[in-house]
A protein has these predicted regions:
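Glycan-recognition and catalytic cores of secretory/periplasmic carbohydrate-active enzymes
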Residues: 1-233
Length: 233
């Protein structure tokens, strides 16, 4: 996934940019596919959601960055890991010319494999990824989504908890060992209201019984407020 820029002549250019904010699209596709009986859209939703879960697991703190770039697959059906391609893309994005320069950049930026660039390494307690994980669990009943949710919750709490609340994080590319050895505190003096209104709500609901705010009877608006559906009869 990413952004696309349309040009004259019916051509377009893909910008392989990922954003935590866009992780809601997995749940959107899956829910629409389920409601309108379009299995292909449910599968698209699964792939998008699984990609966001992977983005959490790929970072040392287990938390996904705000904005990043990756390497698009040249073939949707055959996309094997290619370290040479990754290094080339990371080098090109920084305008580097030698392997020594690239190695130094990867070390300094703490760049995980697969990420060509992390342009915004913050995590601001966003809800979009767990929103889609919740939707996928309710739609499919697959327990792997509960497992992923618990991993995400545990990682976020471990990194963000303070004496009084939870804090946004300024740079999630550090490992816990690096934070301790370098004496760095990435917790910011900020906690958006959506942390409690949305993020924690979806974490709570994915471990609740399915009849609590069932998707058959309720819908959630953009800010995760539930509204009862006006069903026939």
């Amino acid at each position: 996934a990413g952004g696309a820029r349309a040009h004259t002549g019916q051509t377009s250019t893909l910008d392989p940019r990922g954003e935590h904010l866009v992780c809601f699209t997995g749940g959107m596709f899956a829910l629409g596919g389920k409601l309108f009986d379009v299995p292909e859209h449910v599968e698209i939703g699964r792939k998008l959601t699984d990609g966001c879960i992977w983005s959490y697991r790929a970072l040392p703190l287990g938390v996904m960055p705000e904005v990043f770039h990756m390497i698009p697959c040249k073939d949707r059906t055959d996309c094997k890991w290619n370290e040479t391609l990754w290094r080339s893309e990371a080098s090109n994005r920084q305008g580097l010319s030698t392997d020594l320069e690239l190695d130094a950049y990867i070390k300094k930026a703490r760049l995980p494999k697969g990420f060509a660039q992390i342009s915004d390494p913050r995590y601001i307690l966003r809800p979009e990824a767990i929103e889609s994980v919740f939707m996928m669990y309710r739609i499919t009943g697959e327990e792997k989504y509960q497992d992923a949710a618990w991993e995400m919750f545990s990682a976020i709490i471990a990194a963000s908890q303070t004496d009084i609340a939870n804090a946004a994080l300024s740079d999630i590319t550090y490992s816990r060992e690096q934070l301790e050895s370098e004496g760095v505190d990435i917790r910011m003096d900020s906690m958006e209201s959506f942390w409690m209104a949305e993020t924690l709500k979806y974490f709570y609901l994915i471990f609740s019984e399915p009849d609590i705010l069932s998707l058959d009877e309720w819908m959630f608006n953009t800010e995760a407020h539930p509204f009862r559906r006006n069903l026939p009869g």
